[in-house]
Each structure stands twice: as C-alpha cells, then as structure tokens.
Regions:
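Charge-rich, well-structured scaffold segments of protease-associated domains
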Residues: 6-200, 206, 214-234, 240, ...
Length: 292
C-alpha cells in the first residue's frame, strides 16, 4: 500500500512531486487510480483521447518501474510513516499518509472484522496479511525493506499489462517495448500463491473492538460465519455461489437474511460471495447482534 502511493510521487522522466495530482487536474482521463489487493497492486488508466491515453500510459509505466523512491527517502517517510513532534512539549507521534489512512480504516468495526476473517481463514498465505497495512505494524517497516520489495516484485517479469479499446495495438506494444520492457532482463520472481490447507475443524474466534463512549455493548456485537469454497478458477462454481448469494442474502425478502432477522440473531444481515481471493469465501454476518 505504501509502495502504491510512493511510486506515484515522481519518477525518472516525470520528476514532479505529485504527478498523479497533476494528471487528475490536467489530463482528459476517464479513469485514473491505483489499488492495493492482498495478491496484486493495480495501476489502471483510461482516456477517450488517444494522445492523452498514450501520455497516461507513459507516466504510469515510468512511475511503476522507475520511481524516485531510490533517490528520495522522504517519499517513503511522507507516504509511509515518520516521527513527528508538533511542539517541544508535545509527545512524539507517528505520522504518514498510509499510516493515518489505515488508522481511520481500523476505527471501523467492519474493517476490523474483515481483517480478522482473512487472518483466520488464511493464516499461511498472503491473504492472511492486511495489504493495506496494520497501523500497529506499519512503523516496523524500514526504508531498506521497502526498497527491497520494489526491487523484487516491481519487475516486468512479475506483471501483466492489459490494453483494451479502440487503439493501434501494435503501436502501443512497440512503445512499451522500446521505452520500458526491452530495458529489463528476465527475472524469475517467486510470487506463486499456495492454497491454504484445510483445517481439521471449524475455527472459533472471539475478539473485542472499541465502541464509542456514548454506545453500550448491547446490540453492538458482530457474528460472522465464513467458509472457504473451492478455487477462483472454477467459473461454474463461482456462478453457482453468485446465484446463492443473491437468492439467500441479497434479493428482496431473501429467506436466509429474513430468517436470521426474525430469529433475533441480528438487526441486519450482511455477507455474500467474495471471488477475489485464490480461494473464494462465502460469508454470513449478523450486525447489531448480542453475544447471547
């Protein structure tokens, strides 16, 4: 997550402090973003103007492959974490864009529940780690480990590049090869994700989360039941669970949702089918419930 932010803080060809902001303000983009997932980081751009699209592609490729992070440690400190002293009498605190962003995320019980679910279901794979960053552990990341991660994984050999739309595909591929891909030798990157081995029995986990002072514990419990189901490559199974998700939980008058509410299990029922991990998850979550 810190790398996702940091590579967009200037590069060899575009040594601006924040080229991403300049593109947001000055380009004709129809989509411009970057997203971190447990198993990948995505840098998507889109534009209806061919020249603009070409420029966006150039800026993003240079950002990902030739970022200024090797020249300026302050990028890591700004986007990741650093010590800060607001005054000589103030306590020394942590600060940083991603650090503060994730502190905000971890103030949400839904975010905490999602993180705990992933850790419990996938303790031995990357899905059990919070790719956004747990604010408790973010300050343990050193600048050297940060750079090592980029050197290891931010390489064309460990990437997929997708081009889609009405364009001269040969021209775009030739540009990518001439200006970027041909400058790298093949690298054997070990980024294969192994499947989590099944547990011998259902795992029961009970954890606490903070509530506001003006809230009590009554009707503030979350009850979550989660199952790993098959493999994401099984499209027929995925379709079946999408239908089950809609029929049981999402459709108007969905029977499972209504039955749980009628039984007083929770005042709201969430959940569904998540096909984004290698091993998909089907979840049923009762919100505003009680321990009993």
């Amino acid at each position: 997550h810190i790398l996702e932010h940091s590579v967009l803080c200037g590069s060899d060809k575009f040594p601006l402090k924040d080229p991403f902001v300049e593109l947001v303000k000055g380009s004709l983009n129809t989509f411009l973003n970057a997203m971190t997932y447990p198993d990948k980081t995505v840098y998507p751009v889109a534009s209806c103007n061919d020249k603009d699209f070409h420029n966006l592609m150039d800026v993003y490729m240079d950002a990902v492959l030739h970022p200024n992070i090797y020249k300026e440690e302050k990028i890591f400190r700004q986007e990741g974490w650093h010590y800060e002293l607001e005054s000589k009498d103030a306590p020394l605190i942590y600060n940083g864009v991603v650090y503060n962003e994730m502190k905000g995320a971890y103030s949400s019980p839904e975010s905490i529940l999602d993180s705990v679910t992933q850790k419990t279901l996938f303790p031995d794979t990357c899905y059990g780690k919070d790719s956004g960053g747990d604010p408790v552990y973010i300050p343990e990341l050193s600048y050297e480990k940060f750079l090592d991660f980029h050197k290891t994984y931010y390489h064309p050999s460990n990437s997929y590049i997708y081009l889609y739309g009405n364009m001269d595909m040969e021209e775009k591929l030739a540009f990518l090869d001439e200006h970027y891909l041909s400058h790298f030798d093949y690298l054997d990157v070990d980024s294969v994700i192994q499947e989590q081995k099944a547990f011998g029995a259902c795992q029961d986990v009970t954890l606490e989360y903070p509530v506001a002072e003006n809230e009590g514990e009554e009707d503030n419990t979350y009850l979550s039941y989660n199952m790993v189901v098959g493999n994401a490559a099984d499209s027929q199974m995925a379709m079946a669970f999408e239908v089950l998700d809609y029929a049981l939980l999402s459709a108007p008058g969905a029977p499972l949702k209504q039955a749980l509410i009628d039984a007083g299990i929770g005042k709201d029922i969430m959940g569904g089918f998540d096909n984004s991990p290698l091993q998909p998850i089907f979840s049923v979550v009762a919100k505003n419930a009680n321990k009993e």
